[in-house]
UniProtKB/Swiss-Prot annotation:
NCBIfam families named in the record: PRK09489.1
Main location as per UniProt: cytoplasm
Name of the protein this chain belongs to: Ribosomal RNA small subunit methyltransferase C
Subunit relationships: Monomer.
Catalytic activity: guanosine(1207) in 16S rRNA + S-adenosyl-L-methionine = N(2)-methylguanosine(1207) in 16S rRNA + S-adenosyl-L-homocysteine + H(+)
Sorted UniProt keywords: Cytoplasm, Methyltransferase, rRNA processing, S-adenosyl-L-methionine, Transferase
Molecular function terms from GO: 16S rRNA (guanine(1207)-N(2))-methyltransferase activity; nucleic acid binding
HAMAP family: 16SrRNA_methyltr_C
Functional note: Specifically methylates the guanine in position 1207 of 16S rRNA in the 30S particle.
Matches recorded under InterPro entries: DNA_methylase_N6_adenine_CS, Mtase_sm_N, rRNA_ssu_MeTfrase_C, RsmC/RlmG, SAM-dependent_MTases_sf, Small_mtfrase_dom
UniProt subcellular location: Cytoplasm
E.C. no: 2.1.1.172
GO CC, any one term: cytoplasm
Length: 342
């Protein structure tokens, strides 16, 4: 995190207004403005582990990563600055949670890119903190209101589920493919053969559908699942539990918290971070897999066909094969050999 996002640049146009404010930053925190903003006090709350990693280097205990915000995260803050994400249900979940903890009378600012749908903040908060647009620049909108009424928030009411091939998939707002199995994951699942054995790592596990499907027909696998998203981690745990399956699930920025080696690594890696296209996670996944695969172990990933993964795979492993494809997606398979660049 270094250069400021357009949303942060819009906020900086109003920096003089915040000098006496005790601010809680939340939402899609794509830069380190919360650590550098001049104000009376600054805290941050995030559901994204990689955002927590970046901010905690400068903010220490004043930034927290978790599924839901707690009263201690709000502490004595009198102002919320919320960065609007591209996912509206995610925004609603986070705002209802945070505003249920903020004291009535708190200042509420919402900022985001127009293309992210930040305009939806006005109707969403109309009953709690009626918003007015106070600035428009850098293709972003900045909105302000005062909290008039705290919303009621209950985590249980936000859970949803769907069924696929006899499996119950538990989901939360902000989890990839929350409303059903995406086409890419479906293609990857079609390549997983029954009676797979050994240690399997599911990177970017989302709601845990890949691992649950694999374990349902390969009961001898030992599952490890990880994701940067707190809702995804909790959803995966719930999915495994709902289907009587076992596995270790934890938050990790690709391999940052992963220890040991595996016989198979599976993933449908993201190529967006917030509104921005980013291949960082996929590149880290491919290059880091060398250090986490046993000899003869396999990396199997699905990706949009237009993404330049073959080049990265060949640079890292010396080869790749496409084992399934449609017009939009390809499933790549690589077997760990001595030639791979460690």
């Amino acid at each position: 995190m270094s250069a400021f996002t357009p949303a942060s640049e819009v906020l900086l146009r109003h920096s003089d207004d915040f000098e006496q404010s005790r601010i809680l930053f939340a939402g899609d925190l794509q830069d380190d403005l919360p650590a550098r903003f001049e104000c009376a006090a600054s805290r941050a709350y995030t559901q994204q582990f990689h955002h927590w990693q970046a901010l905690s280097r400068q903010m220490g205990d004043n930034v927290r990563f978790s599924l839901v915000a707690q009263a201690s995260d709000v502490a004595d803050c009198d102002t919320l600055i919320y960065y609007w994400p591209k996912n509206k249900p995610e925004a609603q979940f986070q705002l209802m949670n945070i505003l249920s903890l903020m004291p009535v009378g708190s200042d509420v600012f919402v900022v985001g890119e127009n293309r992210s749908g930040v305009r939806s903040a006005e109707p969403m908060l109309a009953d709690y903190a009626p918003l007015n647009k106070v600035d428009s620049a850098r293709r972003c909108g900045l909105y302000h209101g005062r909290l008039e009424k705290q919303p009621q928030f209950s985590l249980e009411s936000w859970w949803a589920e769907y069924n696929i091939d006899g499996l119950t998939i538990k989901t939360l707002p902000g989890v990839f493919s929350r409303d059903g199995l995406d086409v890419g994951s479906q293609l990857l699942l079609s390549t997983l053969t029954p009676h797979t054995k050994g240690k399997v790592l599911d990177v970017g596990c989302g709601a845990g559908v890949l691992s649950a499907a694999l374990a349902s027909h390969s009961p001898k696998v030992r599952l490890t699942l990880c994701d940067v998203s707190a809702p995804a981690v909790e959803a995966s745990r719930a999915t495994l539990a709902a289907n009587g399956l076992e596995g270790e699930v934890f938050a990790s920025n690709v391999f940052s918290e992963v220890k040991g080696r595996f016989d198979m690594i599976i993933s449908n890696p993201p190529f967006h971070d917030g509104m921005q296209t980013s291949l960082d996670a996929a590149q880290t996944l491919i290059r880091g897999a060398v250090r986490h695969l046993n000899s003869g172990g396999e990396l199997r990933i699905v990706a949009n066909a237009f993404l330049p993964y073959p080049k990265i795979l060949d640079e890292t492993f010396g080869f790749h094969e496409v084992i399934a494809q449609t017009g939009r997606f390809k499933v790549y398979r690589i077997v760990m050999t001595r030639q791979a660049k460690k």
